[in-house]
Swiss-Prot record:
The modification N-acetylalanine is found at residue 2. The keyword Electron transport does not apply. The modification N6-acetyllysine is found at residues 19, 97. The gene is CAPZA1. The keyword Acetylation applies. Keywords: Acetylation, Actin capping, Actin-binding, Cytoplasm, Cytoskeleton, Phosphoprotein. Component of the F-actin capping complex, composed of a heterodimer of an alpha and a beta subunit. Subunit of dynactin, a multiprotein complex part of a tripartite complex with dynein and a adapter, such as BICDL1, BICD2 or HOOK3. The dynactin complex is built around ACTR1A/ACTB filament and consists of an actin-related filament composed of a shoulder domain, a pointed end and a barbed end. Its length is defined by its flexible shoulder domain. The soulder is composed of 2 DCTN1 subunits, 4 DCTN2 and 2 DCTN3. This is F-actin-capping protein subunit alpha-1. PROSITE patterns: F_ACTIN_CAPPING_A_1, F_ACTIN_CAPPING_A_2. One of its GO terms (cellular component) is WASH complex. Signal peptide: none annotated.
């Protein structure tokens, strides 16, 4: 370890640590952080040098957070980043301080940031909330209204996760949808992401994403929001169905081809009871 410390600079150590952290599977940030902390063995260096990695991880993962005094959770995303660790909750019209390590919100303050698009944002938010409630058992969403390069833009973010560490798996769904308010038609751009980690007696990850483009008729706020959600629903249903079908095909073909055939005896070896077999006893005596 001494030779390693001599050869690798603190800057390089932090870069490696940050890489591990930003690639932590969903629901396993704390485990990865604690392992990296032990390897680096320098808390001050880790906290100061890798702080950007904590923030990047939470924004990339659309981490949901509950703000005390408010019912709905809000997503931590780059679209709500106000700087200095403050984030926007457009639904509740507040900003708040977010601790990227503890994943806790504090100091809520009034904040108006809909770019004069209040009715558009609220219509899309209301429709998206209903959709997420119907389709995701543990889903959250946040809708932003911003002016980007002179274009009035609606951005919708969806997150849903299932963390089952006792059963050795964790998974997260993320999707992001955008359209500009440019009558009579607008282009809808979406990106869908799935990440699942299974680690019982092995280490398997499913990482998948899909880019989507569609067109949207822009009329009044309510009707446009309805059509926007319909596009989201169709694309996400199609993607999830394709993932399921592809996974089944892989299970029936690719994974099956990797399995070791049964021995001539047509009997599987119970490796947990190997000592009870004759070969096990012979090895033990040897």
């Amino acid at each position: 370890m001494a030779d390693f410390d001599d050869r690798v600079s603190d800057e390089e150590k932090v870069r490696i640590a940050a890489k591990f952290i930003t690639h932590a599977p969903p629901g396993e940030f704390n485990e990865v952080f604690n392992d990296v902390r032990l390897l680096l063995n320098n808390d001050n260096l880790l906290r100061e040098g890798a702080a950007h990695a904590f923030a990047q991880y939470n924004m990339d993962q659309f981490t949901p957070v509950k703000i005390e005094g408010y019912e709905d959770q809000v997503l931590i995303t780059e679209h709500g980043d106000l700087g200095n660790s403050r984030f926007l909750d457009p639904r509740n019209k507040i900003s708040f301080k977010f601790d990227h390590l503890r994943k806790e919100a504090s100091d809520p303050q009034p904040e108006e940031a809909d770019g004069g698009l209040k009715s558009w944002r609220e219509s899309c938010d209301s429709a998206l909330r209903a959709y997420v409630k119907d389709h995701y058992s543990n889903g959250f969403c946040t809708v932003y209204a911003k002016t980007i390069d002179g274009q009035q833009t609606i951005i919708a973010c969806i997150e849903s996760h299932q963390f089952q560490p006792k059963n050795f798996w964790n998974g997260r769904w993320r999707s992001e949808w955008k359209f500009t308010i440019t009558p009579p038609t607008a282009q809808v751009v979406g990106v869908l992401k799935i990440q699942v980690h299974y680690y019982e007696d092995g280490n398997v990850q499913l990482v998948s994403h899909k880019d989507v483009q569609d067109s949207l008729t822009v009329s009044n706020e309510a009707q446009t929001a309805k059509e926007f959600i319909k596009i989201i629903e169709n694309a996400e249903n199609e993607y999830q169905t394709a993932i399921s079908e592809n996974y089944q095909t892989m299970s029936d073909t690719t994974f099956k081809a990797l399995r070791r055939q049964l021995p001539v005896t047509r009997t599987k070896i119970d490796w947990n009871k190997i000592l009870s077999y004759k070969i096990g006893k012979e090895m033990q005596n040897a």
